[in-house]
Design a protein with these regions (language model features):
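Conserved alpha/beta cores of soluble small-molecule-handling proteins
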Residues: 1-139, 169, 173-249
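Glycine- and Gly-Pro-enriched alpha-helical subdomains that act as flexible
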Residues: 139-160
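A contiguous pocket-lining binding segment that forms or flanks enzyme active sites
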Residues: 155-173
Length: 249
């Protein structure tokens, strides 16, 4: 990993890890991204307008390989971490647990990262990829690293609770609406997952159908969505080369 701090331009540094007030991250594939403008807008809503030239100077640092860059605001400094990206996860296995919500700011990415690590360390089952966050009724809200959506026939169902405004969820919901498919808010429960397709969404793995939901000693296997492959191809086909210039918030 390479870390940079913004001082009118990016300066490589060895600052230690510390709490983040705001963060955002995305897959950067050989200079191509999917929805970078949406990620920058989400970051700027919480952290304030990015400095002039920030994006134009960032992109040349991200032109090669499969990367998972993260920008962050920490103690008044803007940071850029250039990290390697793992291979996309074709399916996701989740741990479901009824535990206190670890989030302090559900709609801001960054400040709860340490709490999420502790939450996974305490509750996540070996062999699963992530842990579900639930409301006081046990309904699934999201996971510590991504959004959750469920399909009920042609209807795309999103949680009726509070969750991070996921860029990938926004993209999926926008496509559903373009196709004339209803998007509805609903309680997402393990019982429903036993009979309805459940998808994990984030900008690193795209659309990753949930293959297993571990609930205590039971393993729920949500059914496959018949068009999952088409949807995944659509999302991965949305990567384009970024050249800066018009991108900036």
């Amino acid at each position: 990993m390479r870390r940079y701090v913004w001082r009118g331009s990016f300066v490589e540094c060895d600052l230690p890890d510390r709490p983040l007030e705001v963060a955002d991250s995305w897959r950067h594939s050989s200079g191509r991204t999917n929805g970078l403008d949406l990620h920058l807008a989400r970051f700027s809503r919480a952290a304030g307008r990015l400095p002039e030239g920030f994006v134009d100077r960032m992109l040349p640092l991200l032109h090669e390989g499969e990367l998972f860059p993260r920008i962050a605001l920490s103690q008044g400094q803007l940071l850029l971490d250039v990290r390697s990206a793992p291979p996309p996860r074709p399916a996701t296995s989740l741990t479901y647990v009824c535990a206190p919500d670890p989030r302090t700011q559900p709609e801001v990415k960054g400040p709860d990262f340490d709490a999420f690590r502790a939450y996974r360390g305490r509750y996540q089952r070996d062999g699963t990829d992530d842990t579900v966050i639930v409301d006081r009724h046990g309904s699934m809200l999201e996971t510590t690293t991504g959004a959750l959506v469920m399909w009920d026939g042609d209807a795309l169902c999103v949680s009726d609770g509070a969750w991070l405004p996921s860029v990938t969820l926004h993209q999926v919901a926008a496509r559903a609406e373009t196709l004339g498919l209803p998007v509805v808010r609903r309680r997402l429960t393990p019982e429903l997952a036993a009979a309805h397709p459940l998808w994990f969404l984030n900008s690193l793995h795209g659309i990753s159908p949930v293959s297993e939901l571990h609930v205590g000693d039971e393993v729920i296997t949500p059914p496959a969505h018949p068009a999952a492959g088409e949807w995944r191809d659509w999302w991965w086909g949305g990567f384009t080369h970024e050249r800066g210039g018009g991108i900036g918030i």
